[in-house]
Amino acid sequence: ETGFWLESDRMLSLDFNPRSLEVQRQVVIEEFKQRNLNQPYGDASHLLRELAYESHPYRWPTIGKEIAHIAQATLEEVKDFFFRFYAPNNAILAVTGHISFEETIRLAEKWFGPIPARNISPRQLPAEKPQTAVRRKTVERKVPVDAIYMAFHMSNRMHPDYYVYDMITDILSNGRSSRFIQLLVQEQKLFTSIDAYISGSLDEGLLHVTGKPVEGVSLEQAEEAIWKELEKMKTVPVSEQELEKVKNRYESEQIFNNINYLNVATNLAFFELLGHAEDINLEVGKYRSVTVGQIQDTACRTFVPENCNILYYKAIK
């Protein structure tokens, strides 16, 4: 019950004053420095977002694009944001553990029921226009080695293609026997590390490929090697065995993931945000339904230069 009380108190009567704002401002600024300025490659995601998105707010990192954005936030702006969104009628509560449904409802009504609803404005975000040409950016930083970042526009979280994209990235880089690891790291020895993953964004997201080439391999050579493997996804159908392997891995990961109470609560809340919490039970089936033909068709539509954003992150010698 303490958790219900703490969260309801925060929602109802959060204390806004200049002193507390300044304390939290400094905390966030230090977090920005630690994650984005002082950490090697820390600003790469910021640079790639700005490159890939021209109109959608995804181009803005949640923490802010630069320290000035944090430093210049006023008390009135913070209060206005809070009172626009933090309300019971705009919140999802997920509770897991040794507690009954009836007790959960009782506590929710006790602590959140008296909090007045607020007028929540509809979510209206500008749509990102289709990309029509490759976008490139090169930066130099004090980092150990060069790195390449590539981002391709992909579907939103609710689109059926989302599951296809997730399977594609698993085929490319999930596990020692994946294509990138086996071919580009172990056999050709072009990369010390390489990864492919999707953003999982509610709106149209990004499929990322990131890698660090070995010493002596240029970023141009690294990019060429990546494109070669992506072309294979387009021209040579994935084998049923390879696809079944990543499906089995996903299903086993979901089973282990749901052992943890916090993971279960987080996932239930997320699927309720998407529309229905019970849809979480359909996920494995949706992944299982992905076909070889869908993999190839989606790869052909996605892995083209005009849909790609490329960041060369060069180490200052």
Per-region residue spans from a language model:
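Charge-rich, well-structured scaffold segments of protease-associated domains
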Residues: E1-I120, T138, N156, E187-K317
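His/Glu-based metal-binding/catalytic segments typifying zinc-dependent metallopeptidases
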Residues: K33, E50, I120-S177, K286
